[in-house]
Amino acid sequence: MKKLIVPVLASVFLAGCSTYQKNADIPIIDTHIHLYDTTRPQGLPWPPKDDEVLYRPVLTEHFDKVSDENGINATVIVEASKWIPDNQWVLDLVKHDPNRYIGLVGSLEIGTPDFKKHLTKLSKDGRFVGIRMRERPGGDSFFENEAVWSDLQLLSDRNQTLDVLMFQYSLDDVDMITKRLPNLKILINHVAGADIEGKPADPKWIAAVQKAAKNSNVNCKISGLFQQSHRQPSPRNLSFYQSELDVLWEAFGEDRLIYGSNWPVTMRGGTYGEYLAVVEGFFADK
């Protein structure tokens, strides 16, 4: 089995993370987890209080245990809160262990007047590696806002990354961005939004994946597999996910297909170990 750390991570996530010690013995970097504290006096925007699985404190001591049990040596946090101060909250939360928590993909609203100010301030910390597009203010007219393109250009100029969540965005959106900003490093979240049903992958989805993957700066995370399953509880057998994973492997290859779990959301479908076993099973013969 090839190590679940690929060359793109060195350039995308580790550049600027001066505290990270390169070590050939590190087998796995999880590029997609969330940390939050539901007991904070100010509360938090996500997860909702009625989520019986996720609404509880999810802090470093909880992921430390999971990562130690499963051989995860380093991780990148993806900020799930839309509150700007929560970016710094996470950076402060993990500053005691910079070798394990090596980066943060932040949450800032693209196309807003203060985007550059907030990005500049947060980027003074080398662990702040980029942002994620999650919500889509303005709906279909979002990309008609030139301020959006100015902010995306700023990310590209800074050599920072753009994570794209497929719930309100599409692979066609990714393709459009790459055509206008070919040097922007993009990481598509959650197996490119695949609808996984345990049967041959949707031909339209395959074509969209292949189109988006033509740009060498577009990468894809094998994250959220359990969440993309139409069958619940999520199957734990690799064969159920094989078709979509094969498509992604053919499109992105070993250099641009990146491991991420989406923990603790993975717990809706199974344990971390069960999730990792599916991914390791896929890479076993690669």
Segments predicted by a language model, with ranges:
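Mid-to-C-terminal alpha-helical segments outside catalytic/metal-binding sites
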Residues: 2-4, 19-21, 26-31, 56-74, ...
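C-terminal motif of bacterial Sec signal peptides marking the signal peptidase cleavage site
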Residues: 15-16
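An N-terminally biased module of ancient metal coordination in phosphate/nucleic-acid-related enzymes
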Residues: 20-89, 94
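Short amphipathic alpha-helices and their capping/turn segments at secondary-structure boundaries
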Residues: 21-28, 116-124, 172-181, 203-214, ...
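Short, well-ordered coil/turn segments that N-cap beta-strands
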Residues: 24-27, 71-76, 98-103, 125-129, ...
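Active-site metal-binding loops of divalent metal-dependent hydrolases
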Residues: 33, 80, 191, 262-263
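Active-site gating/metal-coordination segments in enzymes
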Residues: 84-169, 176-179, 221-227, 233-235
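H/E-rich (His + Asp/Glu) clusters that bind or coordinate divalent metals
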Residues: 195-286
